[in-house]
Amino acid sequence: MSNQIETRYLSQSADPDVELRLETRDDGRPVIVGMAPPWNKWSVDLGGFKERFMPGAFRKYLDRAPNDPRGKADVVAKYNHQDSAVLGRTTNGTLDIQETDKGLVFRATPPVGTPTTAEVVPLIRDRYI
C-alpha cells in the first residue's frame, strides 16, 4: 500500500452539489462550511478517470480512537493544498468533519491574523470560490 497522499480540489463550478459557504461565530470569527464529496455521484474527469464516493467511505478513518496505534485521525484543511495555508485541523479542534446522508460535511475555523485567512474569507464570502 502506498503512503502517497492524494489531493482533490473543491470546485463548485465543476460540481454544483459541492457546497461552500461562510458563517460567523458569536465572537465574530469566520467559519468555513462545506460539503464535499457528495455521495453516489461521479466526479468530473480527473485526468483519464472518474471517481465516486459511497456513504461510509471515510468512517473508519474518522472514527479512529485516540488510543489507536496509528493515532487519532489528523485531518488538515488547506487552501489549494499549500502546507503554509492551513484553514483548520481536527487535532486542535479547528476542523470538524462529519459524514451525513448527503456527503462529507466540514466546518473549519481558520486562524486569526494570517494572510491565508485574510485572502480566503472574502473570496468565499463574495462567492468567488
Task: Name the predicted role of every residue range.
Residues 1-129:
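Signature of dsDNA virion morphogenesis modules
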